[in-house]
């Protein structure tokens, strides 16, 4: 009887309808039928059964299996790649307030319009102490809008955090901060980095999205001040069909944009046919450069296992845009006491549909991208039908999302 073995670091992952061969060493993914997966197992484990010669020859010619002196003792599992690896949380968002002076139509944080809550200085210190004790080295202070907090309190928060973390970033909207306040931060919390958002380089369009006249002028003035003061800063925007972006201005640093998550006020009303075609995960767009790196990063950098988000009410969430999951409330407690290990280990295995998909170890999960109120629903933009092993038509999906006339755009 001939014996075979897998040719290097190769894993077979089974799905509901089809299977996938992860050829890590040769940087390839092969979509195969279950008969092929069965043939691989039977061949390398030395099972006494008739092997399909055509499939066997294809496996040999593609270097999936090679002849061997003896059969393998067991099929390796792709999770073997993760042995010895650790998931260490190093970053946390701290929502110092959910109050905001803007009314951005896409904002993931809708609570600011319903329930006003800002952290007290003592609450903030407790949060910082617990994060530092847990080993968090990087934080970002966010809102709402941090500058709705009294200056004395906010500056005390910045000073306290500055002395306890390796990296600290303040994310604000740029409409309430003065040049003098920026100068104070540059002098008194020198390692602070600044982040703010600008979604259009056309005044009327930016103000339309924020729903506050004059916001564009104030934001761009802040960007100019940051550039003149030589502070470390970045600015970002979102892709939305609701406004025109215009010609990019030079504010001294690269400008980056991201797709709107369907959280808070974010909804499909911000997407048109063009944006949906960019966003949908299709057979053509499901690609990777380095399969090993992709698989390891998806496991090690799963958002729920990398971040904490502490709300202004001291509730601890796994993600800044995902509040359907919670570790618990930090008020009067230690962070180590409330951390939910099941959230830290959250993966595609927990997601409906994805748990039955053979590509689940090569596909990043983002919980805010579920379309309904079901927090375990698969991402709305994935076109792979794992139950039937086929990729859905993108035009048909766009019609479902935007209406029957959408593709005609």
Language model features by range: what are they?
Residues 58, 62-67, 71-192:
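Conserved alpha-helical substructure of the radical SAM core
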Residues 7, 322-409:
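Flexible mid-to-C-terminal extensions adjoining Fe-S/redox cofactors in radical SAM and related proteins
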Residues 53-76, 299-300, 304-339:
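A broadly conserved sequence feature marking short terminus-proximal activation segments
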Residues 111-115, 208-214, 372:
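Short glycine-enriched, charge-decorated loop/helix-capping segments at active-site entrances
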Residues 1-112, 132, 399, 407-409:
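N-terminal pre-core extensions flanking Radical SAM catalytic domains
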């Amino acid at each position: 009887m001939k014996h075979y073995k897998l040719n290097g670091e190769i894993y077979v992952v089974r799905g509901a309808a089809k299977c996938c061969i992860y050829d890590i060493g040769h940087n390839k993914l092969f979509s195969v039928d279950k008969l092929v997966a069965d043939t691989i197992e039977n061949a390398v484990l030395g099972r006494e059964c008739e092997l399909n010669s055509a499939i066997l020859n294809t496996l040999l010619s593609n270097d999936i299996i090679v002849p061997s002196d003896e059969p393998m003792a067991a099929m390796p599992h792709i999770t073997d790649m993760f042995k010895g690896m650790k998931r260490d949380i190093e970053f946390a968002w701290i929502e110092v307030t959910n109050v905001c002076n803007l009314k951005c139509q896409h904002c993931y944080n809708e609570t600011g319009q319903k329930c006003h809550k800002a952290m007290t200085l003592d609450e903030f210190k407790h949060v910082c102490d617990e994060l530092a004790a847990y080993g968090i080295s990087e934080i970002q202070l966010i809102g709402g809008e941090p500058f709705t907090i009294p200056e004395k309190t906010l500056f005390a928060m910045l000073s306290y955090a500055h002395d306890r973390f390796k990296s600290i970033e303040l994310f604000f909207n740029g409409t309430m901060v003065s040049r003098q306040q920026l100068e104070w931060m540059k002098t008194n919390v020198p390692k602070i980095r600044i982040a703010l958002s600008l979604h259009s380089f056309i005044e009327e369009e930016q103000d339309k999205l924020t729903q506050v006249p004059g916001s564009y002028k104030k934001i761009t003035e802040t960007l100019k001040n940051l550039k003149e003061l030589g502070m470390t800063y970045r600015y970002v925007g979102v892709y939305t069909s609701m406004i025109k972006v215009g010609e990019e201005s030079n504010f001294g640093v690269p400008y980056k944009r991201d797709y709107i998550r369907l959280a808070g006020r974010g909804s499909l009303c911000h997407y048109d046919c063009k944006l949906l075609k960019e966003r949908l995960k299709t057979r053509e767009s499901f690609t990777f450069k380095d399969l090993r790196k992709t698989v390891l990063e998806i496991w090690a950098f799963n958002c729920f296992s990398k971040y904490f988000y502490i709300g202004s009410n001291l509730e601890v969430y796994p993600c800044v845009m995902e509040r359907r999951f919670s570790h618990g409330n930090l008020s009067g407690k230690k962070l180590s006491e409330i951390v939910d290990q099941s959230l830290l280990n959250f993966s595609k295995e927990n997601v409906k549909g994805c748990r039955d998909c053979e590509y689940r170890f090569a596909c990043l999960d983002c919980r805010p991208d579920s379309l309904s109120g079901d927090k375990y629903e698969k991402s709305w933009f994935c076109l792979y039908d794992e139950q039937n092993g086929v990729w859905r038509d993108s035009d048909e999906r766009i019609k479902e999302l935007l209406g029957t006339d959408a593709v005609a755009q």
